[in-house]
Amino acid sequence: MINLYLHAGSDNHGCEAIVRSTVSILNEKSRLYSLNADKDLKYGLDTICDIKRDTVTVYPKKSLKWFISAAQTKISGKIDLAVKIQRKELLKNIISKEIFLSIGGDNYCYPGTDVLAAVNRNIKKKGAKLVLWGCSVEPKLLKNPEIVADLKEFDLITARESISYNALKTININTVKVADPAFTLPKKLLSLPDNWLERNMVGINASPLILQNGKDSNTVYMAYRMLIQEILDHTDCGVALIPHVVCDGNNDLEVLAQLYDEFKDNDRIMLIGDHNCMELKGYIARCRFFVGARTHATIAAYSSCVPTLVLGYSVKSRGIARDLFGNEENYVLPVQSLQEPDELTKHFRWLVGHEKEI
């Protein structure tokens, strides 16, 4: 039995894509521990794997379990017991020698690595094998001894790009470089909107996260707006605004709907609604160009041979582009370095000018 854990839910269609492609690649009976099982059921993951709820239970302050876990944390300096109590459904039935794949991908790029480490130690104590699957890790994080200690415990690490691979190999010899599993995700072709221009659409993905990671969110938003204006005014292409994450509080549709409203009187622009990851890839694959913020939206484009520009904020976007093209210059625009709204448009012009060679 293959166990997949640290899955946040399929309303992040990148997470959904990782699960679908991983289960297909491994071709083994699989169990998915999900932090949002209802969303996985909505998008049909129960048809390919057994879904278990990874419920995080928070006990009232000064309850018995709270006192026990607080005492252990005070004495040992670790939160292992607290996490074991909170994540009972995940940790109660671990069988020795079973394989547990940590599928968060970029979980180590965000806060909360102490919880990840505690979950991993609890699994390892029961004799299971740990795999960090398709990951990206900012090299500077490896200056943190606690993160290094955690990563050393994995029996296998598959890094999805060379920047992370080169860093992780220095601390865990069981590190290999393997493409993100979502490159193998099949696409599902739905009927296209009536105003879809065959082989002449620019797919655009934007996210609240990319606005937050820029130096100024308004500059990032205006960069998207200026790009759309450029396409409508100076090309004969249509524009398809395509979401890839629809989580509460981090929903691409909120940004995309705002952009759509500014141009909705032009029949060459459309807003694609929410779909599962295979259906979204079906739309992306039929674009002529793609400009995206979400990693797995851009992976859908890359793997469909669609010339792609990434507005990125982390090591994963730079590393994947470097592995595909030899360098990330012109293929990735780091949002942190975006100073003027027209920079995104300038990068898109380069993409159009190099369409055939890409």
Report each predicted region and the residues it spans.
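Active-site anion-handling motifs in enzyme catalytic cores
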Residues: 1-358
